Amino acid sequence: MTEMRSAKIMSGRVFAGARALYRAAGVSGDDMGKKPIIAIANSFDEFLPGHVHLNKVGRIVSEAIREAGGIPREFNTMAVDDGIAMGHTGMLYSLPSRDIIADTVEYQCNAHCADALICIPNCDKVVPGMLMAALRLNIPTVFVSGGPMEAGTTVLADGTVKSTDLIDVMYATADDNVSDEELLNYEKTVCPTCGSCAGMFTANSMNCLTEAIGLALPGNGTILASHSYRKDLFKRAAKQVVKIAHQYYDDSDDSVLPRSIATKEAFENAMTMDVAMGGSTNTVLHILAMAQSADVDFTLDDIERISHTVPCICKASPSGKWEISDVHRAGGITGILGELDRAGKLHTNVHSIDYPTLEAKLADWDIMRPTCTEEAQQMYKAAPGHIISPEPWTHTTLFDSLDRDRTNGAIHDINHPEIHEGGLAVLRGNLAPDGCVVKTAGVPPEIWKFRGPALVVDSQEQAIEVILNDTLKPGMALVIRYEGPKGGPGMQEMLYPTSFVKGKGIGKQVAMLTDGRYSGGSSGLAIGHMAPEAANKGPVALIKNGDIIDIDIEARSVNVELTDEQLDERRRELEAGDGYVAHRNRHVSQALKAYAAFARSADKGATRDPELINKLSGLD
């Protein structure tokens, strides 16, 4: 038996005051010291459609925990909507919020002696922030996200009915052929329900990754927020966290702890799945940060190794025609994992919050196996309801059948891949000696090799300007620098630039490179996370207009056609002048300066530098 963390304050004269406060907050004296305190880390927020319904989720989870024999204690953390923050200085705050969210959850759980944790995230930085906290705390933890939004249904001016999502309205913004009336039609129809944005963007990628790593139940990444089955998932997750809390404290079973689940092998499985489904490049940042929180030796080199050996077998929006509901119908994350298992790409001896091995889980939840349960087959039939409403659980609509077509369906088998290369790739060269990342699933085959002159800007705002005023021409490589973790600061996303080049009709004719990052909704030849970043004296700071940029995705290379001697000469010139300073007007708040002071480059997950923190604090 392992003593509950809350035991220290639930008995003895010294902590009578703490117990008095717990009583005042609604905890029964009869439960104190007998039932585990389950912290509910919610992220309800009326700014985000992905989080607007989470207050209701929190109530469901709380009641289910109480019924299962736990003491639920709900609290809230922040949530930044990247789509709303996009394209202006609000985006500087998005990535830094990840680390603050992690701190918030750690502070709350440790300050109040929580015995276990259930996390209710949904959107981009909330999921990894809570994952980082769970791995730091290492107490019994279950994740259950709010669920993805349904895709929109938009009737175009010519009468065509099109499946749409948020990215479509952003493309339309820069398309001179789209009238204001048509743009308003997109605006009203592309986001029809609550939930995280409908494609395989960052939020859904991270929720899928959480399921793959073993900290969430099947369906977490793909059951729509609007479907009644999502409500069932919340109840099951709540009961599961109480169950594993008892396993740990009553039976001393530490296999249920996050660090026991999220091992090196589990990280490799999660990244293998991510590469196979062509997830957001942001997942690279977040999985590196998570590994550091778990003290797991998983680096960009591991991601590079995996990307060479795993093909892309699922191309969802924005890289392909499938929406998240289509991926769900094809078996969801266990469907993708099942195909990877048959190809020998997974460690199936890893365990999760609900199964002793991945192999056992796939036996029950992989729709291609004869042993797949009726419960699983029914769950994966959950379909869109096409009811425009911010309310969750509005329908019980089911598909007539499952998508088991592994040649032309939403999920392919390993013998019929969408792309023989993985959906994500790490590139290196004299422009990014420490690496950079590209979502190969979203790059048209004709520009996997690219050579062209650079057009250099020092901010996203400048990038948008040169795109919209047609300074960026076909054949050019747009280099956006000083947007890294330290240089931005905050490493903002470049969704507007990638969307606007598509709106201008040159998405297949230009390259884009940045030490910042891209939205999960970005596609095209968009290379991000260049490391070292410009503000850390990276070579990207030395590039000038007209320099020839050479990119070869198959060879995993990204270079500028300059000799080492020429680069050294430019470095001397730069350091004799202004130095590594962006030429732009941007106010940077004290909060962002604090982030910049400790931020590491993207190849380290853009996390705070632990060595610098230890040095300055004087604490081990």
Curated annotation (Swiss-Prot):
Gene3D superfamilies: IlvD/EDD C-terminal domain-like (3.50.30.80). It is an enzyme of class 4 (lyase). The modification N6-carboxylysine is found at K125. The active site is at S519. GO terms for biological process: isoleucine biosynthetic process; L-valine biosynthetic process. Keywords: 2Fe-2S, Amino-acid biosynthesis, Branched-chain amino acid biosynthesis, Iron, Iron-sulfur, Lyase, Magnesium, Metal-binding. Its cofactor is [2Fe-2S] cluster; Mg(2+). Its EC number is 4.2.1.9. Signal peptide: none annotated. InterPro entries: Dihydro-acid_dehy_C (IPR042096), DihydroxyA_deHydtase (IPR004404), DiOHA_6PGluconate_deHydtase_CS (IPR020558), ILV_EDD_C (IPR056740), ILV_EDD_N (IPR000581), IlvD/EDD_N (IPR037237). Mg(2+) binds at D82, D124, K125, E493. Pathway: Amino-acid biosynthesis; L-isoleucine biosynthesis; L-isoleucine from 2-oxobutanoate: step 3/4; Amino-acid biosynthesis; L-valine biosynthesis; L-valine from pyruvate: step 3/4. [2Fe-2S] cluster binds at C123, C197. It comes from the Bacteria. Binds 1 [2Fe-2S] cluster per subunit. This cluster acts as a Lewis acid cofactor. One of its GO terms (molecular function) is dihydroxy-acid dehydratase activity. Functions in the biosynthesis of branched-chain amino acids. Catalyzes the dehydration of (2R,3R)-2,3-dihydroxy-3-methylpentanoate (2,3-dihydroxy-3-methylvalerate) into 2-oxo-3-methylpentanoate (2-oxo-3-methylvalerate) and of (2R)-2,3-dihydroxy-3-methylbutanoate (2,3-dihydroxyisovalerate) into 2-oxo-3-methylbutanoate (2-oxoisovalerate), the penultimate precursor to L-isoleucine and L-valine, respectively. Belongs to the IlvD/Edd family. PANTHER family: D-XYLONATE DEHYDRATASE (PTHR43661), D-XYLONATE DEHYDRATASE YAGF-RELATED (PTHR43661:SF3). Homodimer. This is Dihydroxy-acid dehydratase. It comes from Bifidobacterium longum (strain NCC 2705).
